[in-house]
Amino acid sequence: MVILGKLMARRLFLSSLLTLILSLMVAGCGPKPKVTVAPAFRPVAAETVYIVPFTGALVPETFSETVFNDFVDLLNGRRRETGVRSFAILKDEVGAVDVGWLAQQHYVSGEIWSYVEETGCCATNIRVKVRAYLTEPGKRVPSVEIFLPMESFFEHDKSTIDLERGRLARNIARELAVRFSAALSPRR
């Protein structure tokens, strides 16, 4: 009887350990934030960097508005670090802006996609991916690309979906602003 108990405890321990290891391996396979900077990119003090409204398919409008507006506000708060005099919002989509004029400007564009809310009886997980680009004057290919996959998990008795959407949107805006500021900083 004692031997059977030790054997059972050992199997339980080993199966728990195997489950933990496999869980860590699977969690490590998810997408990671990534900043790609072209080798030829050298930050320069720019008068104005224009920011084009981010595109978003199947993303709640208030969510994408919060990401975009907070991102612009945070970038403007970091102007001194970046050497940029101002970050200005272009009111039109990229396709509506004069291509010749835009090609002569520094501008940021981006997209929010893969927004998923998985709700169960007691908790919700929100996942979203964001990609933003900085394109320099005269270049067709962006010089800086930032990819951010982010998520928020919460229990329904601790928070609400609206609060968590707002929190996640503000976190994304903050991460984008920090990473763009670092890329634009002359002290890179």
For each predicted feature, which ranges?
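A structural detector for beta-sheet-dominated domains
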Residues: 38, 52, 131, 149-151
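Surface-exposed short loop/turn segments
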Residues: 92-143, 153-159
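Sec-dependent bacterial lipoprotein signal peptides
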Residues: 1-29
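Second-shell loop/turn segments in exported
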Residues: 53-62, 119-120, 157-163
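A structural "domain/chain start" motif
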Residues: 27-80, 177-188
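Short beta-strand->alpha-helix linker/helix-N-cap micro-motif
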Residues: 76-101
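Short secondary-structure boundary motifs at beta->alpha junctions and helix caps
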Residues: 125, 135-186
